[in-house]
Amino acid sequence: MLIPVLLFIVGLLCLIKGGDWFVDGATGIARRFHVPELLIGATVVSIGTTLPEVMVSTMSALSGHGEIAYGNAIGSIICNASLIAALTIAVKPGKVDPKSLRTPVLFFFVAAAFYAGVAYTTGYFSRPVGLILLAMFAAYIICNVMAMKNAPAPEEEEEPEENASFAKELGLLAVGAVLIAVGANLLVDNGTLIAQALGVPESVIALTFVALGTSLPELVTAITSLAKGHGALSLGNVIGANVFNLVLVSGVSATVAPFTIPQNSMLFGHNASLVLEFPVMFAVMLLLTLPALFKGKLSRPQGIALLCIYAVFCVVQFTI
């Protein structure tokens, strides 16, 4: 039991450092070619911080553990909104630009409605469903690129540091990707062993520990953004990452190895995935995005409320 736990921790550390280096490399390259910062945050950073979820869910689906593939995607969305974004809001509430959030928020709820529709009707995420989700991902990227195409470059463009060469940035990108792949493999294999040893359903492990572990890059980004006074960037990254969790993470998983919604636990006589996880996902995203869209601000009570929801969600997961 000790070895799987240690390897699980090593996997998490690889994911954290891999995600950190990947984002540094990708952001450095984007800045080198004068790509607007908002586009970097909406695409490159979100893709980079979502890579752990992509790797974990794909490997889980390929190894026949569809519960982890599903639970990691949905669990990461809930974790991103009600823990990571909530922490940043509770610590440092502030104003945001509603216009910059409209596209990711719209895409999220369109994708979430489609995802939930499949879950409630068939419960089976087939290869065609995966391809539709990937098409949504492509559309999201295209819309962001088009929206930012005519955006002015930052007034003060920082010159790349002497030691931050193009080769170094490519190296960070490549090594980060490798660490993410290794970490994801360790996380899935040993997370499954721990779940079996404790008698805990894989879906619960995926919705809590694995989801939290693969969301750590978003947490690192959120803390960094807070430290530099860019809380809105953190919110944009969280929402963008949640879009990717639905359309990219689940899309790749379903395309590579179709999976079904897990039915390990029941709540009120129904599948807990359908009566608990989806409603919580929609609830936390609505609570996170509506004040930002209509009032242009994020308040401390909003962050505290989201944290309370996440705490209750975790307690319920381990008691049903």
Regions found by a protein language model. Name each.
Residues M1-I320:
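Hydrophobic alpha-helical segments, chiefly the membrane-spanning helices
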